[in-house]
Structure formats: structure tokens, C-alpha cells
UniProtKB/Swiss-Prot annotation:
Topological relation to the membrane, as annotated: Lipid-anchor
InterPro entries the UniProt entry points to: YsaB-like (IPR025728)
Taxonomic path: Bacteria, Pseudomonadati, Pseudomonadota, Gammaproteobacteria, Enterobacterales
Lipid addition sites, N-palmitoyl cysteine: C18
One GO CC term, this protein: plasma membrane
Signal peptide interval: 1-17
Name by which UniProt lists this protein: Uncharacterized lipoprotein YsaB
Keywords assigned by UniProt, alphabetized: Cell membrane, Lipoprotein, Membrane, Palmitate, Signal
One Pfam family of this chain: YsaB
Superkingdom of source: Bacteria
Location of this chain's protein in the cell: Cell membrane
Lipid group attachment sites (S-diacylglycerol cysteine): C18
Amino acid sequence: MTMKYFCSVMIAIALVGCTATPPPTQKAQQSKVSPTRTLDMEALCKAQAAQRYNTGAQKIAVTGFEQFQGSYEMRGNTFRKESFVCSFDADGQFLHLSMR
């Protein structure tokens, strides 16, 4: 009798556990960066790339801007088609320049 009761309770617990709803998925918050801050980041990226490639900032083209969960990246190239990526933190502070 105890075995029947025990099996019934275990089956009931298993069924209750299967019907539990999964927690909602979390989505990353998208913060907006101001247009003036974006322009400042672009100017800083161009200046850093111009210094690295020993050319003028006017010969540097920024071709892309991507926002990630905790950082930003600006892609660009020189007039000689040399690619680079500028990385910024979540506050828009320059981190580093990567040559590609």
C-alpha cells in the first residue's frame, strides 16, 4: 500500500515538474548613443588611424558602426584600401585600433 502511494506521489511530482513554465528569455538592452558622441568617436577613430597609417585624417573613410552589448566598433579603410577597426567601450571611450 505504501509503495502504491509512493509511486503515485512520484508520478504526480514528475508531472508537475514537467508543466512548469520556463523563465522568460532576457534580451540585451539597446542604449542609444547620441549623434554628437558618434561624430566624436568617428573623429577620434580617424585621428588614431591617420597616425597609425601615417596619413591625413581626410584620407581615412569610416564605413561601418556596430553596437555590441558593452562596446562599439567602427570599421574603416585608408585610401590604400588598408582596413582597420576602432573599438570603444560602453561610454564611448577609445580602447584600441586593430589593423585588418
